[in-house]
Design a protein with these regions (language model features):
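Nucleotide-sugar-dependent glycosyltransferase catalytic core
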Residues: 6-39, 76, 82
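Noncatalytic linker/hinge segments flanking ATPase motor cores
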Residues: 31, 48-59, 108-116
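C-terminal, non-catalytic tails of nucleotide-sugar-dependent glycosyltransferases
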Residues: 38-57, 97-105
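Secondary-structure edge/capping motif, primarily at the C-terminal ends of alpha-helices
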Residues: 47-50, 72-78
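Short, charged, amphipathic alpha-helical segments
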Residues: 55-61, 84-89
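Amphipathic alpha-helical repeat scaffolds of TPR domains
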Residues: 59-73
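Membrane-interface aromatic/basic loop that binds lipid-linked glycans or pyrophosphate carriers
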Residues: 76-137
């Protein structure tokens, strides 16, 4: 956010992107994917310094980032998920902490609410189910 002095929130309900066959979305998890969480934590700190009323909104986005990272971990083979258990634990710990922010959970879509609650409660089951749901085709 550099030297930003103002933050604006818009009502646009979606986004668009180009699916790059060689892009990050198609690559397996590496520890650098944890940077997505760190970047949103840093962005939140900067945004809240400008407008504290956006805490729930920006935290809901951080929660989605945590769940996207957990999804990357879920796509790994079971042996690799075990090798990356520390990152799974970090995601779970951060998720449980962020779910405590008033209003953040309520701003999530129904799908993200379900995913977040399941991953926070039983991460192994969530990762197993996510892995096999994606590979069933």
């Amino acid at each position: 956010l550099g030297y930003a002095r103002k933050v604006s929130e818009i009502d646009y309900p979606g986004y668009g992107y180009y699916q790059n066959a060689k892009g990050a979305m198609n690559r397996p998890f590496t520890p650098s994917y944890m940077d997505q969480i760190t970047c949103w934590e840093l962005a939140r700190d900067r945004i809240l310094a400008i407008d504290s009323a956006l805490e729930a909104k920006v935290t809901s986005i951080l929660i989605m980032g945590i769940m996207l990272t957990a999804g990357k971990l879920a796509m790994l083979p079971a042996a690799d998920r075990r090798k990356n258990a520390q990152y799974i634990q970090i995601c779970r710990d951060k998720l449980k902490q962020e779910l405590q922010v008033s209003g953040a959970y309520e701003l999530l879509s129904g799908g993200y609410r379900l995913k977040a609650k399941l991953f926070a409660a039983v991460p192994g089951l969530y990762l197993y189910g996510y892995h096999f749901r994606k590979y069933k085709d």
